[in-house]
Amino acid sequence: MHQGSPTQIAEAVSKGNADFAIATEALHLYDDLVMLPCYHWNRSIVVTPDHPLAAKQSVSIEELAQYPLVTYTFGFTGRSELDTAFNRAGLTPRIVFTATDADVIKTYVRLGLGVGVIASMAVDPVSDPDLVKLDADGVFSHSTTKIGFRRSTFLRSYMYDFIQRFAPHLTRDVVDAAVALRSNEDIEAMFKDIKLPQK
């Protein structure tokens, strides 16, 4: 198991140096990879309890634009969707710090360096009781995490098992049907009516 940027892990799989790439960004750049959608996720806004946004039920993109932001480095963990949301609103985010890891971002928020924008699943009420999590579903569109592997890969039983443990809807039959399709656009069409898990 190796962590890297989406481009690094997709490249590793494309070259045969890894079996799978699991990412939200950049996998579409590799036509030689079969990409299967695993789950949808969105972001949350995290602040300290004394922050002016902490008392709000929901936050608009206009309100968010008024504060310094701490979020993921571009190319990691759905960062492009954050940029798209601000561009769509005609706003420029004030990003003061970036990191590849949600725990680092939460530390910056705790230090008062900015408002955090991270994956919702990265905020845990047990380990993060000192942070206030605000829903950002109305601010950002969801992202989809995918698992990718080389189209030429002979999938062994343990590989099918790994895929299905990671994404239970990706049974052996579903994976085989997707692999038989000609392109990732066809795979996207195959999954358009399948309700993916939300994390």
Question: How does the language model describe each region?
Answer:
Residues S120-D128, G138-K199:
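C-terminal effector-binding regulatory domain of bacterial HTH transcription factors
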Residues T24, A54, P68-A89, L155-Q164, ...:
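Secondary-structure junction motif
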Residues M1, N87-V96:
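A local structural motif
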Residues S5, S60, T100-D101, A119:
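Short loop/turn segments at beta->alpha junctions
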Residues M1-L29, T98-A99:
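Central regulatory/effector-binding core of bacterial HTH transcription factors
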Residues Y30-N42, D103-S152, D161:
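Beta-alpha-beta core module
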Residues D32-R43, V47-L69:
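Flexible hinge/capping segments at coil-to-helix
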Residues V13-I22, R43, L91, V109-G116:
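Alpha-to-beta junction loops
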